[in-house]
Regions:
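Terminal, low-structured helical/coil segments at or just beyond the last alpha-helical repeat
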Residues: 281-312
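Acidic, proline/glycine-rich low-complexity intrinsically disordered segments
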Residues: 1-262, 267-271, 278, 307
């Protein structure tokens, strides 16, 4: 295996450090640690003992389990029911190969949560299973920020435990203040609570931390824009999300609602058709059961918009 690593100042284009490594494939994790330590030394960073430990933590020593985790992650991001099922199988295989692999449990739990959110499964057992798997991930590695994020989402979607959901997102931020996903999660929770102005601030911070943010970030930002009266900006952001990933069901759903609100009926119906393409059993009653908007008036408004757009 040959790796050429470069560290470049993004603001100036200046090469801070570059090195080539030739190693046997079995040494991939040791090589990863070595590269990280070289970057830290080059940047002259002063790390706490906790941060040093986090940098060299090995998620797994099983290369095959790691391969299944990466392959599962790729399928998970494709956002179709079929690729989602493939992702779950790969995460399950990663756990079988390494029962101590915390990140694999975390990812496996996410598959159960998303299956519920996208109405690919009608059963609440999915949320129970997601909760169990995220807890297992945190037993194995309490410092995983995104496992706390997912646990917070389960609290939100399963029991409407808004304060507990916020607490989990804040715990994730405390564990790693540079983890963009933690701020994204906090922003989403706040939009459901009717605190969208705050949510916009957190989403902007998340996007600064991760300039290559996924479509999910845009969907949450668009939602916050809508609830603060910035309707045209919301539409633009939802459209950008779908340009990045045309299979993002939630972006189609929210865009259908906003199009309906502004009288763009044909476009609203087209977005509902996309939702049904991705999840044929998707229904208004399913949205009512799932969407954790705290204000009942907001939920009814959302449902009315989708009904006008043709969702049944």
């Amino acid at each position: 295996m040959r790796v050429t690593a470069q560290l470049i100042d993004a603001t100036t284009g200046y090469h801070l450090w570059s090195e080539r490594y030739d190693r046997p494939l079995k040494d991939i994790f040791a090589l990863q640690d070595e590269i990280v330590q070289k970057i830290v030394a080059t940047l002259k960073l002063q790390l706490t003992l906790w941060e040093q430990g986090d940098l060299v933590r090995k998620r797994t020593n099983n290369l095959e389990a790691y391969d299944y985790f990466l392959r599962g992650s790729e399928q998970f991001l494709r956002l179709t029911k079929e690729t989602h099922a493939q992702a779950r199988q790969m995460f399950e295989r990663a756990v079988e190969l390494d029962p101590q692999y915390a990140e694999a449990y975390q990812a496996l739990g996410y598959t159960y949560l998303r299956e519920w959110m996208f109405q690919w499964s009608p059963t609440l057992q999915n949320l129970e299973r997601a909760f169990e798997l995220e807890q297992q991930a945190l037993v194995l590695d309490p410092s995983l920020p995104f496992a706390h994020v997912l646990l917070g989402w389960v609290h939100l979607w399963k029991d409407r435990q808004y304060e507990q959901a916020i607490a989990e997102a804040e715990r994730a931020i405390a564990l790693d203040s540079n983890n963009a996903d933690s701020y994204m999660a906090l922003a989403e929770i706040l939009t459901y609570l009717g605190r969208s102005e705050e949510a916009i601030g957190w989403m902007e911070k998340a996007m600064r931390l991760n300039p290559r943010y996924p479509a999910l970030y845009l969907r949450i930002l668009g939602t916050a824009y809508y609830w603060t009266g910035r309707t045209e900006e919301a539409i633009t952001v939802f459209e950008r999300a779908l340009a990045r990933n045309p299979n993002w069901l939630a972006a189609h759903l929210f865009l259908a609602f906003v199009y309906s609100e502004v009288g763009r009926e044909a476009e609203a119906k087209a977005e509902v058709a996309e939702v049904l393409r991705l999840s044929p059993a998707f229904s208004l009653e399913g949205v009512r059961q799932r969407l954790p908007l705290k204000d009942p008036a907001d939920l009814e408004r959302f449902l009315d918009g989708l009904r006008e757009a043709g969702l049944k």
